[in-house]
C-alpha cells in the first residue's frame, strides 16, 4: 500500500508521460524515451554500480530547482516560515518527511519542506525514489539516492554523476 504522498508524486510524474495524454502537444508513438530517461536519472536499483545512467550533461540546473515552491505554495525567498538564508546548510532528516527524504540522513535544507511537484520531479542526495523496480509495492523498500563520494549514486566513471546535485526523476 502506498502513501498519499507517493501516490501524488507518481500522479505528477505520470501526467507528463501518460500515453496519449489529452494535453499532448506533440507525440511520437513509434519511439521509446527509455534511453533519454536513463541519461537523466540516477542509478537506483539493487546493483547501482552495475547500471548505466545519470549522465552529467542532463541535470536540472540550480535555477530550475529554485523555481519550485515551498510546502506553503510560495517561492522559497518569499515564504516567511522557510529559512531561505540557510538553504545550503546541512540538516539531518529525522523522519518528519518519510516519503520524500531518506530517514536519518543529512542533506541540504533546500530539500526540506518543498511542494509535491519538487519531490515528484527532482532527485537529490537524500531523496526517496519510488519506481517500478522497487523491491516491493511498499515504501518500506523504497530506493534512496545517496550521491556523495563512495556512495551508491556517487560519481561512477567519467560521466555518470550529477554536476548540480540534482537529477530529473521523470521526463
Write out the residue ranges for each language-model feature:
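Active-site beta-strand/loop architecture of penicillin-binding DD-peptidases
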Residues: 149-171
Amino acid at each position: 500500500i502506498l502513501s498519499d504522498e507517493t501516490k501524488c508524486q507518481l500522479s505528477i510524474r505520470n501526467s507528463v508521460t501518460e500515453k496519449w495524454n489529452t494535453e499532448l502537444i506533440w507525440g511520437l508513438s513509434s519511439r521509446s524515451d527509455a534511453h533519454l530517461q536513463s541519461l537523466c536519472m540516477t542509478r537506483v536499483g539493487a546493483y547501482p554500480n552495475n547500471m548505466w545512467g545519470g549522465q552529467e550533461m542532463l541535470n536540472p540546473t540550480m535555477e530550475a530547482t529554485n523555481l519550485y515552491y515551498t510546502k506553503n505554495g510560495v517561492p522559497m525567498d518569499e515564504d516567511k516560515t522557510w529559512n531561505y538564508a540557510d538553504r545550503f546548510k546541512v540538516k539531518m532528516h529525522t523522519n518528519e518527511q518519510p516519503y520524500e527524504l531518506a530517514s536519518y540522513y543529512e542533506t541540504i535544507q533546500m530539500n526540506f519542506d518543498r511542494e509535491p511537484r519538487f519531490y515528484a520531479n527532482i532527485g537529490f542526495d537524500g531523496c526517496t525514489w519510488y519506481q517500478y523496480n522497487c523491491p516491493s509495492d511498499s515504501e518500506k523498500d523504497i530506493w534512496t539516492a545517496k550521491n556523495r563520494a563512495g556512495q551508491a549514486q556517487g560519481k561512477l566513471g567519467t560521466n555518470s554523476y550529477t554536476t548540480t546535485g540534482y537529477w530529473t526523476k521523470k521526463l
